[in-house]
Amino acid sequence: MAKQAKMVVDKAFSISKIDKRIYGSFIEHLGRAVYDGIYQPGHPLSNADGFRKDVIDLVKELDVPIVRYPGGNFVSNFYWEDSVGPVEERPHRLELAWKSLEKNEVGLHEFKKWADAANSEVMMAVKLGTRGITDACNLLEYCNHPGGTKYSDLRIKHGQKDPYGFKTWCLGNEMDGPWQIGHKTMDEYGRLAEETAKAMKLIDPSIEFVVCGSSNKDMPTFALWEDHVLSHTYDYVDYLSLHTYYGNRSDDSNDFLAKSDDMDEFIHTIIATCDYVKAKKRSKKNMYLSFDEWNVW
């Protein structure tokens, strides 16, 4: 017998205004996500820049306010300087995260153009696996500094006079994972993220940071990772990332539909850990969450 669900909404019991970025997404140079996904030159539905107009229209319809780029695991082997300048002069590189070849046809400028067409902001990730502070600062200077310096003038030379002004920056990706190129221990990463954030703020004090939390709650270092990383970075970052993916490998529909409860528990556990570090530091600052990877896999 079918049962009818009922929801009661009382506007007098509002909690807070919803940050529109909760509806954000991310894209990565993985499989056909970029090449043939959003970018397919020569296709009848592609625009003059090679981007699929039908995909752009769908993203606009979804009203995605912010998109994280370029990854994902991809960022740990991403050489941003290879992705700018004349396309025909860009080198091809072995892409080690997903074991493919990166031709750099879609680079920083191209993706920003796509994001503008889709009415989305760019949430830029820096490479803290195989590089570090200097590389992150150079990228920020290229993207956000007005001009008169090596990397801002290089951006201008590449045809982009005005700075991009990217506001939100991710300090690496899933650095707790042994699969990550340049994987770090919790304290190695915490110190690196702290010093990177401090240095980048000297270039652009207006930016905000997302620091890597655990790649999923089943990691053996889960919660300890958040504690140690935030103990280093709490005063310098604004968001802690959460990632999780759900599947139904056991073909159990009831269990699968209950995964939303598991996600709620995950969020509350992270909040408790953030509050613990806040108390430990005697801080008045609240740490916010960036749930920047979640889906059905």
Which residues does each PLM region occupy?
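Long, well-ordered, tryptophan-enriched scaffold segments
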Residues: 217-218, 230, 236-258
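Non-catalytic accessory regions flanking glycosidase/transglycosidase catalytic cores in CAZymes
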Residues: 1-223, 231-238, 263-264, 268-297
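Active-site substrate-binding loop specific to GH73 endo-beta-N-acetylglucosaminidase modules
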Residues: 226
